[in-house]
């Protein structure tokens, strides 16, 4: 009876929370794209807003990388209704129906619903009106011609601050028929992958390297039964010129449905790509697809939620919106990017001097910085988003061979060497690696004061994988080679370096000498950094690899003003006179054992010493 009462109480609380889940509603239109509302599903994101009576949205699809590794938007879409219900409307309402995963806009008897299919890359726009109205549909593209990459614009791609003179973004192709528009970006034969491979001395193994940019085509098709192509025109939005392909209703109607199907794939020809797109189109069934998408979103919210009233209501709101945007990339082949995910908007509304295209995002599109990516993915363990973590795990798994080839070519030993700022093809970002390097520099090491020897961040994702087994009893067998290779790198590489310095590859206690190394990006030329040791100890213990664990040094301690605490690095007798030589980019590396690798990394360190560590 007690168990039954608890069950009833749980069901009641669950019902109340579900019932209390609010829609996020606006009662006035927006001024520009910075006031847009997220909408999406699967691996598709839309920024939706109403401006001067027009319904607009950007479309982003995960994996749409161009030749320079910019993550491209698929275009901007504009819907203009006549007579216009949204101009000077007294009953304007725009809602993110978060529980069902769609956006609804209404005024003066007109309702527009936008939703993305969770299980296939298809967007639906459904327009309902009490009276017959006309509709204009604009497909707007700013890549209608080759675009010279301007000052600061390199931050959106892998060149960053070192954009070669004359570098362009190649134009898109746009093909119009009577009632449809086909649009796509096709990467040229040479991409940033080829440039990076040559820069980093890997041309002899180029054909063995995973290359996600080769023959990549991204785009889609928009169509509707009641549309007919009208004309093109040019304009400027948010400081960026564009060309619009404009369709109009054949006749006024009370109901209009517009569909956009997307496709991103590596195809040797445009015809093969279009075949893949048409396969998706052939599977569309709007009624059943919508039901299945709503079922998915309902289950997504029912399995995990935070709902708080009172002073913390804003915290609850922000958490829910952030989680919704994470859910929009749940079925992606690529991780949700830390710098905006699928939902960036025109940069001029962040910084008025950045009159750059909607494709712009600082910190790149195809460059993944591990210390930032981890912040997106660690919390998913607590919220039970194990399926959402898969794209991040698969990201590293796909890059494993490339990381292992780096070790084999540069140092002739085994193990996966993953950089901190990692390209989507598994090599260090070329600008961080260094365009102007002395001939004597080790080709496997970034010539970079912040990132040299910063190799331990991949271990955080290894531990995330291991934690999914602890949290969810997940089958992680496919990732075991990745994890084992990541830890084996440190064993192989630091024995290799020790033998370059002298006869012995271990210290007097039979431990690895982790020098030169880096305690996060902060303490450079460190010996036995706390962050790396904690990572190795935690992962090896979770993995059950005691044979390698015994070679890992203890987490270093130091005493300051009579108080013992965790040290960034260890002071031992090696060729470096102290445990560190320089300090860069301030991060609390000594807190990594406290906060990130909490299960095993500092089990033998007393609580008082942990508390003294700042």
Residue ranges of predicted features:
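A conserved hydrophobic secondary-structure block that centers on an alpha-helix together
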Residues: 110-112, 117-122, 131, 143-145, ...
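Aromatic-residue-lined binding/catalytic grooves and analogous aromatic/hydrophobic interfacial grooves
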Residues: 20-435, 533, 541, 548-613
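Intrinsic-disorder/low-complexity regions
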Residues: 4-5, 128, 472
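Contiguous, well-ordered alpha-helical segments that form the cores/surfaces of helical PPI scaffolds
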Residues: 3, 323-324, 374-378, 449-467, ...
């Amino acid at each position: 009876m007690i168990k039954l009462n608890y069950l009833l109480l749980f069901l009641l609380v669950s019902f109340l929370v579900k019932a209390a889940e609010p829609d996020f509603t606006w009662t006035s239109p927006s001024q520009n794209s910075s006031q847009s509302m997220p909408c999406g599903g699967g691996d598709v994101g839309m920024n939706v807003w109403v401006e001067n009576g027009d319904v607009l949205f950007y479309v982003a699809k995960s994996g749409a990388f161009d030749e320079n590794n910019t993550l491209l938007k698929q275009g901007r879409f504009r819907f203009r209704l006549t007579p216009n219900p949204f101009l000077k409307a007294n009953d304007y309402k725009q809602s993110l129906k978060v529980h069902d995963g769609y956006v609804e806009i209404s005024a003066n008897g007109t309702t527009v619903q936008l939703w993305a299919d969770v299980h296939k890359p298809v967007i639906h726009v459904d327009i309902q009106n009490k009276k017959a109205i006309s509709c204009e549909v604009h497909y707007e593209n700013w890549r209608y011609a080759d675009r010279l990459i301007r000052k600061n614009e390199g931050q959106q791609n892998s060149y960053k601050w070192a954009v070669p003179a004359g570098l362009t973004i190649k134009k898109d192709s746009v093909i119009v028929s009577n009632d449809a528009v086909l649009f796509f970006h096709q990467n040229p034969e040479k991409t940033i992958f080829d440039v990076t491979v040559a820069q980093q001395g890997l041309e002899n193994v180029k054909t063995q390297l995973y290359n996600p940019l080769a023959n990549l085509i991204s785009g889609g098709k928009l169509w509707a039964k009641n549309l007919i192509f009208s004309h093109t025109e040019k304009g400027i939005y948010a400081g960026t010129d564009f060309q619009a392909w404009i369709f109009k209703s054949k006749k006024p109607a009370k109901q209009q449905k517009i569909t956009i199907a997307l496709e991103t794939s590596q195809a040797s020809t445009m015809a093969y790509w279009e075949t893949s797109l048409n396969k998706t189109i052939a599977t569309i069934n709007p009624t059943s697809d919508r039901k299945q998408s709503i079922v998915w979103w309902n289950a997504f919210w029912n399995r995990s939620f935070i709902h708080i009233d009172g002073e913390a209501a804003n915290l609850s709101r922000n958490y829910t919106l952030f989680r919704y945007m994470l859910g929009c990339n749940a079925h992606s082949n690529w991780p949700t990017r830390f710098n905006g995910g699928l939902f960036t908007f025109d940069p001029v509304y962040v910084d008025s001097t950045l009159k750059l295209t909607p494709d712009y995002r600082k910190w790149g599109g195809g460059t993944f910085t591990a210390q930032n990516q981890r912040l997106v993915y660690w919390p998913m363990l607590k919220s039970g988003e194990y399926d959402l973590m898969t794209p991040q795990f698969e990201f590293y798994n796909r890059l494993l061979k490339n990381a292992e080839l780096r070790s084999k070519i540069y140092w002739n030993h085994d193990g996966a060497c993953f950089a901190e700022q990692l390209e989507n093809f598994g090599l260090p970002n070329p600008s961080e690696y260094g365009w102007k390097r002395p001939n004597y520099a080790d080709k496997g090491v970034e010539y970079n004061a912040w990132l040299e020897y910063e190799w331990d961040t991949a271990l955080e994702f290894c531990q995330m994988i291991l934690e999914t087994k602890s949290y969810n009893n997940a089958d992680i067998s496919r990732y075991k080679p990745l994890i084992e290779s990541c830890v084996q790198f440190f064993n192989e590489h630091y024995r290799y370096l020790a033998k370059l310095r002298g006869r012995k590859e271990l210290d007097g206690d039979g431990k690895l000498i982790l020098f030169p190394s880096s305690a996060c990006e902060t303490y450079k030329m460190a010996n036995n950094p706390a962050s790396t040791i904690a990572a190795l100890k935690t992962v090896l213990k979770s993995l059950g690899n005691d044979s390698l664990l015994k070679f890992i040094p203890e987490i270093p301690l130091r005493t300051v003003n009579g108080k013992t605490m965790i040290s960034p690095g260890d002071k031992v007798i090696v060729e470096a006179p102290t445990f560190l030589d320089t300090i860069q980019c301030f991060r609390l590396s000594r807190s990594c054992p406290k906060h990130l690798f909490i299960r095993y990394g500092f089990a033998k360190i007393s609580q008082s010493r942990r508390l003294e560590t700042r």
